[in-house]
Amino acid sequence: MQIGLCLPHFGRHLETGRLLEVARRADTLGFDSIWVTDHVIVPKDVYIAYREEMLDPLAVLPWLAGVTERILLGTSVIILPYRSPLPVAKLLASVDVLSGGRLIFGAGVGWMEGEFAALGVPFKERGSLTDEALELIQKVWTTREPEIDTKRHRLHGLSASPMPLQHPRPPIWIGGASEGAYRRVARYGDGWHSTAATPEAFRQGADAVRRFWAEAGRPGAPVLSLRIPFWLDEIHRPGSDMGYLRGRPAIHGTTRQVIDALRGFAALGVTHVALDVSLTTYPAILEELDVLAREVRPALGG
């Protein structure tokens, strides 16, 4: 199992020096990936962490490319209906080039209805907007002079650049826990990026993804990944921030309990996990990274 972490580029951890230390330490310690989170403008009634200041992930991502050397750079996830897909494709392709081919593109439809209203994006059209964006992004990433007609875009006689460094393109992992999301994995993606699932919920989602993948005639198997809140009880027990969870699953406990929980997900097919460390303090994050690198990753074959 490959282990990554979600960079806490929001809330109380929003300090450049801290983000730099976390990113470079993860890179140096051998973590497999580091992930950014997407929200633009957040209603007051949603999770406490998202009401605090948050840097734009599409600004953080190229910064990460410049301050790290080997760690993979992922988006967990870019909410595609919020932005025009062609500038997003160009920016992400540029990040892939500048990082030496380290991009993982996680994409989703979004869920925060008030955020859609603020941005003037029809909430009920988010599925079709996402599908069209994925079709366009794949096309401009793999074809120098793409020819494509969609509901909202016409590309003829145009040149797309830069091409991503990865061939044929960076991996695309689709987020979400609905039938539409599972079908989207089979149609447009290379893998499923699940969020804060119980083992049983993950198993059900993974079974659906595999079924639609086979029905679509896709070769091989989809990548199965998981983003989930994490902390080590012996280092820090979150207090007031537990409101962020709102009953969502998390991986926590002793080091041995965390290893066992991750092994349980590995048995369900998870090959990549992105641990959300934002619930703990900054000193605790640094200490947890050391424990993960020293004890957890080796136990999981990392």
What are the roles of these predicted feature ranges?
Residues M1-G302:
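Active-site-adjacent structural elements that line small-molecule/cofactor binding pockets in enzymes
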